[in-house]
Swiss-Prot record:
Described function: Catalyzes the condensation of carbamoyl phosphate and aspartate to form carbamoyl aspartate and inorganic phosphate, the committed step in the de novo pyrimidine nucleotide biosynthesis pathway.
Protein name: Aspartate carbamoyltransferase catalytic subunit
Pathway assigned in UniProt: Pyrimidine metabolism; UMP biosynthesis via de novo pathway; (S)-dihydroorotate from bicarbonate: step 2/3
NCBIfam families per record: asp_carb_tr, PRK00856.1
Source taxonomy: Bacteria, Pseudomonadati, Pseudomonadota, Gammaproteobacteria, Enterobacterales
Natural source organism: Salmonella typhimurium (strain LT2 / SGSC1412 / ATCC 700720)
Gene name tied to this protein: pyrB
GO MF term list: amino acid binding; aspartate carbamoyltransferase activity
Keywords: Pyrimidine biosynthesis, Transferase
Residues noted as binding carbamoyl phosphate in the record, renumbered to the chain: R55, T56, R106, H135, Q138, L268, P269
Enzyme kind, highest EC tier: transferase
Positions contributing to L-aspartate binding: K85, R168, R230
EC number assigned by the record: 2.1.3.2
Length: 311
């Protein structure tokens, strides 16, 4: 059947409607249950990481290989013409797009992925993270995990903790969950790392309930999902980082009184914000969440690169 995501750029979670999200998640579930090792057999995909990454890059490249695609690219722009010779991003993308069927791209500069779409011709660009702006494929695996564990994506109580200012994952996830009905958000962060006002304004416009809190304890008994984030050292000056890094830490003892099916998620890497004793509790779900990245990214690649898809 024809699908609306064929050859579509995926730069922001706002590029996907609620129906699009449901299509990706349904496709991910099918691929998890029934692997398709030759679905992208004759496709070549560029994996272009201008910024360091472990999970996102390996998850994307594993997804490509498991669907049968060929993979080219780099994990460090320092050894490319852009890094060594001063080639522009526009020229880099213009050239790469002549070689491949799709470009997966991470870049430290906000807006870089959107800029790349202006020079990629008919080749779709998938944003694997652009600065502190957007991380749509992380959001897809987050949604897939929430749906798997809670059985729904509406009427949920979701707490987001830590670096809500620079954490692109929480920006994208909040925007995505706002497409569904009845969700309530609890934001727990230091004042210096509070959720951006444009996100709060968006929730107000959609009539979504939200509130600000000073501790995890305040909301523990009320939430279905506790979404932890690390304080991003690379985006703060050293003195600011030292002041806030340990302000919100989750320990196993903090989970007393949590709902039985409440799950703790984290986009990883974690530093000190979740102690290892949490790993042994039934609430810890961040490693399963990371594993779901394979299926969410496989689904997106399959849909973007196939005009018709029947699984």
């Amino acid at each position: 059947m024809a699908n609306p995501l064929y050859q579509k750029h995926i730069i922001s979670i706002n590029d996907l409607s609620r129906d699009d999200l449901n299509l990706v998640l349904a496709t991910a579930a099918k691929l998890k249950a029934n692997p398709q090792p030759e679905l992208l057999k004759h496709k070549v995909i560029a994996s272009c990481f201008f910024e360091a990454s472990t999970r996102t890059r390996l998850s994307f490249e594993t997804s490509m290989h498991r669907l049968g695609a060929s993979v080219v690219g780099f994990s460090d722009s320092a050894n490319t013409s852009l890094g060594k010779k001063g080639e522009t991003l526009a020229d880099t993308i213009s050239v790469i797009s002549t070689y491949v069927d799709a470009i997966v791209m991470r870049h430290p500069q906000e807006g870089a992925a959107r800029l790349a779409t202006e020079f990629s011709g008919q080749v779709p660009v998938l944003n694997a993270g652009d600065g502190s702006n957007q991380h749509p494929t992380q959001t897809l695996l987050d949604l897939f995990t929430i749906q798997e564990t809670q059985g729904r994506l509406d009427n949920l109580h979701i707490a987001m903790v830590g670096d809500l200012k620079y954490g692109r994952t929480v920006h994208s996830l909040t925007q995505a969950l706002a497409k569904f009905s009845g969700n309530r958000f609890y934001f727990i962060a230091p004042d210096a790392l509070a959720m951006p006002q444009y996100i709060l304004d968006m929730l107000d416009e959609k009539g979504m309930a939200w509130s600000l809190h000073g501790s995890i304890e305040e909301v523990m008994a009320d939430v279905d999902i506790l979404y932890m984030t690390r304080v991003q050292k690379e985006r703060l000056d050293p003195s600011e980082y030292a002041n806030v890094k340990a302000q919100f830490v989750l320990r196993a003892s903090d989970l007393n009184g949590a709902r039985e099916n409440m799950k703790v998620l984290h986009p990883l890497p974690r530093i000190d914000e979740i102690t290892t004793d949490v790993d042994k509790t039934p609430h810890a779900w961040y490693f399963q969440q990371a594993g779901n990245g394979i299926f969410a990214r496989q689904a997106l690649l399959a849909l973007v690169l196939n005009s018709e898809l029947s699984l």
